[in-house]
Amino acid sequence: MKPAARRRARECAVQALYSWQLSKNDIADVELQFLSEQDVKDVDIAYFRELLSGVAVNAASLDALMAPFLSRQLEELGQVERAVLRIALFELSKRDDVPYKVAINEAIELAKTFGAEDSHKFVNGVLDKVAPTVRKRK
């Protein structure tokens, strides 16, 4: 699968996770609704599904990984930033095939696309601190 298809999977995952975090609906329902309403022809659907289910199942442990490195309480974290950080930490902790730098760079790009004005700086700062505790730099 092309790298662009993975990037699109991450972009879609941010949007679907944002919806899930706000709605508290079942992740399978969020996935079905998202796939029925969005244009996903250039998306690595299998990877999108893995990110979505993987983050949902591991949300508490992913939050616990990032919490010590946040400059504010986890509850005060913006929903976009939380979704982006959860995806990056899922990739770093569960997907050894995703290079360390790729996971971080993709998260920064996602934050630039979907986050507030300086959220990419915040995401970069958090991941710069937490990532080495999750996986060795390669």
From Swiss-Prot:
Q: Does the keyword Ribosomal protein apply?
A: no
- Keywords assigned by UniProt, alphabetized: RNA-binding, Transcription, Transcription antitermination, Transcription regulation
- InterPro entries, from UniProt? NusB-like_sf, NusB_fam, NusB_RsmB_TIM44
Please tell me one Gene Ontology term that the record gives under cellular component: cytosol
Q: Which Pfam families match?
A: NusB (PF01029)
Single annotated GO MF: RNA binding
Biological process, per Gene Ontology: DNA-templated transcription termination; transcription antitermination
Superkingdom is: Bacteria
Belongs to which family? Belongs to the NusB family.
The protein's role, per its UniProt record? Involved in transcription antitermination. Required for transcription of ribosomal RNA (rRNA) genes. Binds specifically to the boxA antiterminator sequence of the ribosomal RNA (rrn) operons.
The protein, known as: Transcription antitermination protein NusB
> Which organism is this entry from?
Yersinia pestis
**Which gene carries the instructions for this protein?**
nusB
